[in-house]
């Protein structure tokens, strides 16, 4: 085929568009275009985003040579770009990269006014980020990962809105975190992942401008001594931690949505109240303004054993409960009674530990011994996720659903998300639901059975089976 008349459409594009296209390519591929012509070499010099990942170059047979090649490549890329403005710089490196090469790279992009800095630095030897990084006047987003030491004399990041710290260490522990946050006057989004503050004397997050906070640690055999969180404008919270010894100050005045996974100290799950370490009361009392709340099964356990009282959740309209075969529902009755405006109740599974202290929301005790708090519940919608996931307890799950339907007069809709690959199972459950129509506490309630695995849906109402 004669290609002599074909046009080079890419090369004929305006330089701004070509440069924009290059910014979406991995840096290794984008850099390779610089050998095509002088024009492409010029264009690459103005690519605003650099994504440099050592793993792209790794070869297990000769890691030393590959690491050296990667370091030389980064040097060439930065030299080629000169002093051109840079928007985003992402660097992912391992132990094979020399620390003395990393510092100049970071300083180079800081001097060029980078606004989005993403550093994944895994080193067996101690590595400290350059102090200039904590005095940047251009950084808007900063992400630091994988074991570096955060050491700084001064911090002032006047434009920083998003800060993500994962598996890093603070030289002065709680004092270091406090100093870092105090130097971020307009911070809005903070993620602290795998930060070992259980070993600190205290931990404090005090940021008046913060809107979103995510904290997570997987340490379960130690508990933090003291945790304070003063965030009056926070609207979203995702919090995973072991119950602290104390919570001197907690301010969630503006909180709208919270995902809480508080855990008892490992080994204390079956202890009595007098044996508990820590007390979650001051923390739980401060989340009472939320509209949407997710509670893990661990948190249900904390509410039972490590919380003096359950607050009134006047604003709560959506509540999600995670169930666990090893954890009871003792705290659930009080939680539902103290949620006077709850509209949607979601269960991630129904199987829980049988106990005579579950109150009146389940069938752990004989039916004749209980008066259901559900009879006065304002809940309009119940969603059951993972229904049928534990097939050995199907009868217990069906009885629990029946109990909900027969005792909740305000219920308008129940949706069951059935985890099954059997059409026969769906048909059987649908038939059982149909037989319950005359016993529903709510005359307007609709029950919908959905199986995504089978792309099937069955709906039952007081008028009978609507569709299948």
From Swiss-Prot:
Domain (F-box): residue spans on this chain = 7-60
Q: Which UniProt keywords apply?
A: Leucine-rich repeat, Repeat
InterPro entries reported for this sequence: F-box-like_dom_sf (IPR036047), F-box_AtFBL13-like (IPR053781), F-box_dom (IPR001810), FBD (IPR006566), FBL60-like (IPR055294), LRR_dom_sf (IPR032675), LRR_FXL15/At3g58940/PEG3-like (IPR055411)
Q: What residue stretch is flagged as signal peptide?
A: none
One Pfam family per UniProt:
F-box
Q: Where are the LRR repeats?
A: 114-136, 138-167, 169-194, 216-241, 292-323, 324-349
Enumerate the SUPFAM superfamilies for this protein.
F-box domain, RNI-like
Task: Give the matching CDD domains.
Answer: F-box_AtFBL13-like (cd22160)
Q: Which PANTHER family match?
A: RNI-LIKE SUPERFAMILY PROTEIN (PTHR31293:SF12)
Spell out the protein name for this chain. Answer: F-box/LRR-repeat protein At4g14096
Species = Arabidopsis thaliana
Which classification does the entry list for the species?
Eukaryota, Viridiplantae, Streptophyta, Embryophyta, Tracheophyta
């Amino acid at each position: 085929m004669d290609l002599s008349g074909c046009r080079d459409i890419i090369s004929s594009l305006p330089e701004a568009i070509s440069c924009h296209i290059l910014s979406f390519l991995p840096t290794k591929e984008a850099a390779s275009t610089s050998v095509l012509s002088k024009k492409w070499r010029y264009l690459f010099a103005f690519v605003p985003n650099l994504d440099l990942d050592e793993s792209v170059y790794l070869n297990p047979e000769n890691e030393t040579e590959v690491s050296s090649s990667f370091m030389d490549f980064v040097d060439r890329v930065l030299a080629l770009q000169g002093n051109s403005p840079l928007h985003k710089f992402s660097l992912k490196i391992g132990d094979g990269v020399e620390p003395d090469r990393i510092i100049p790279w970071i300083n180079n992009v800081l001097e060029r006014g980078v606004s989005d800095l993403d550093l994944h630095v895994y080193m067996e030897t101690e590595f400290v980020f350059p102090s200039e990084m904590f005095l940047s006047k251009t950084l808007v987003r900063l992400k630091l990962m994988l074991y570096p030491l955060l050491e700084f004399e001064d911090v002032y990041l006047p434009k920083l809105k998003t800060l993500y710290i994962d598996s890093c260490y603070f030289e002065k522990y709680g004092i270091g975190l406090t100093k870092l946050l105090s130097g971020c006057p307009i911070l809005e989004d903070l993620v602290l992942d795998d930060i070992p503050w259980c070993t600190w004397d205290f931990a404090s997050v005090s940021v008046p401008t913060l809107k979103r906070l995510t904290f997570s640690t997987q340490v379960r055999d130690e508990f933090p001594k003291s945790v304070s969180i003063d965030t009056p404008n926070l609207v979203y919270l995702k919090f995973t931690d072991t119950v602290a010894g104390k919570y001197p100050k907690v301010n969630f005045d503006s909180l709208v949505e919270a995902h809480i996974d508080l855990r008892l100290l490992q080994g204390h799950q079956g202890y009595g109240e007098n044996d508990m370490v820590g007390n979650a009361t001051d923390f739980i009392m401060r989340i009472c303004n939320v509209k949407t709340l997710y509670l893990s099964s661990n948190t249900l356990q904390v509410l039972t054993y490590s919380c003096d009282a359950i607050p009134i959740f006047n604003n709560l309209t959506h509540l999600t409960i995670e169930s666990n075969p090893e954890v009871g529902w003792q705290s659930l009755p009080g939680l539902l009674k103290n949620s006077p405006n709850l509209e949607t109740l979601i269960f991630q599974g129904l199987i829980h530990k049988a106990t005579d202290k579950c109150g009146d929301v389940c069938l752990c005790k004989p039916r004749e011994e209980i008066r259901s708090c559900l009879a006065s519940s304002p809940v309009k919608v119940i969603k059951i996720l993972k229904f049928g996931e534990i097939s050995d307890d199907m009868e217990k799950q069906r009885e629990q659903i029946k109990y909900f339907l027969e005792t909740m007069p305000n219920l308008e809709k129940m949706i069951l998300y059935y985890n099954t690959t059997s059409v026969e199972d769906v048909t059987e459950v649908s038939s059982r639901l149909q037989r319950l129509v005359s016993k529903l506490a709510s005359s307007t309630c609709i029950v919908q059975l959905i199986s995504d695995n089978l792309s099937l849906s069955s709906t039952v109402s007081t008028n009978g089976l609507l569709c299948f």
